[in-house]
Amino acid sequence: MNKVRNLSVDELKQEQIHLINDIYALAKSKGLSNDDIEPIPDGVNDLEAYVKSNPRVMWVLKEPYDNFKTDGTPCDGGWNLFDAFDKDDAWTNRSWQPIIYILKGIFDKLLSWDDMDWIRDDKTMTELLKRIAYINVSKMPGM
């Protein structure tokens, strides 16, 4: 039986950078990426927190959301999902709100909504988004 070697946090960071570069290269080679649209990479924001986390959580999503042209075709991308978590208004994103509440329940072992603060009252709950893994099935915005 093969023994699995645990990677260090630095090795994981390098692997994540390598995967992100591969995503950009593949999108370009397949004609999915151009001046109007680029991939939005996924992965883990805070690898140290993720490695220490118990349990380790990975959230699988359909696709990243971004802007659309007037004809309805997706555009933009090229931004980092993790940078969005550092914004003061990150908690207002409706896609992330249920994720935040579920993570709060998991990590703080809360079984009732009544035991939780509202995100608007405790914006630090948004920090939970940084310690899990994200996988978008499609890396392209709104496709």
Where do the model's predicted regions map?
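A polyanion-binding, active-site-adjacent surface
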Residues: 2-143
